[in-house]
Regions:
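Secretory targeting and sorting signals
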Residues: 2-37
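Polar, low-complexity loop segments and adjacent catalytic/binding residues used for recognizing
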Residues: 36-261
Length: 261
């Protein structure tokens, strides 16, 4: 399990900057082996942030934290009650094109907390932020497709350790759910999301961050991302929330392989 100590935070809002290529890579400049380069050379990995946190729009309780190793992470919630935060790349990507992203997640507090985070494709803009608690920070972001990593069992949830595909900003209805064999809370894990635009196929994989861990396919669903998000070009990023139970909800080593809009 990775262990790092936070040193400093940036300001709550960090915006601006342009991407020089068609690929976004957040917090680390190494491309995962699973994301193959396109033959036309439009896909190339590079950092989308610097020490000032440009190229990110941070909303609500989201902030950018620097660890003692120099690594930066997005903290969506800081273990306060009824928090919600979102973080978006400020550069749009083609939602009607094939896409892959990977990132590490650490959801933690002194006791089992809530509520979880989500990765979104959305067409509403870099200031989008939804509701707290079971809203996962995405409730009301209607032009969106979300993959949720949920650590609290609300009324319509199967359990307190599940993944879900959520459409149109409504976390009370799931297109699909799955229960991973690893805990989503208390230990960091790796997630990978792949979208095949030709087949409208969304796949979600998870893997623990321990020796000999194996990546597992958890969700494999048909969804037209561009149609559901209401736009051929849109934003990608994260939301997260807490309610009466709390959690520190961190995302790091975020890499995106997608055509620039």
């Amino acid at each position: 399990m990775e262990h790092v100590v936070p040193l400093s935070r940036t300001s709550r809002l960090a915006r601006g900057g342009l991407l020089a290529t068609a690929v976004l890579s957040m917090l680390v400049s190494v491309q995962p082996a699973s994301a193959a380069a396109a033959p036309d050379g439009r896909r190339e990995s590079h950092p989308i942030t610097d020490a000032g946190g440009r190229n990110l729009s941070l909303n609500g309780t989201a902030s950018l934290i620097t660890w003692n190793t120099g690594r930066r992470l997005i903290q969506l919630t800081s273990a306060g009650f009824q928090q919600m935060g979102s973080a978006w790349s400020t550069e749009r990507v083609g939602l009607d094109r094939s896409f892959e992203t990977s990132f590490k997640v650490f959801l933690h507090s002194s006791e089992h907390g809530a509520d979880g985070i989500a990765f979104l494709f959305q067409g509403e803009g870099p200031r989008a932020l939804g509701g707290w608690g079971g809203g996962l920070g995405l409730r009301g972001i209607e032009k969106s497709v979300a993959v949720a990593f949920d650590t609290y069992q609300n009324t319509d949830d199967p359990n307190s350790n599940h993944l879900a595909v959520i459409l149109a900003g409504n976390p009370d209805q799931h297109l699909a759910t799955a229960t991973p064999s690893i805990p989503l809370f208390g230990k960091p894990f790796l997630a990978r999301i792949s979208y095949n635009a030709d087949e409208h196929r969304l796949r979600v994989y998870v893997r623990g961050l321990y020796p000999r861990a194996v990546e597992k396919l958890m969700l494999d669903e048909n969804v037209d991302v561009a149609q559901t998000a209401g736009a051929q070009q849109g934003w990608v990023g994260f939301t997260g929330s807490t309610g009466d139970l709390v959690s520190r909800q961190d995302v790091y080593d975020w890499t995106v392989d997608a055509p620039k809009a």
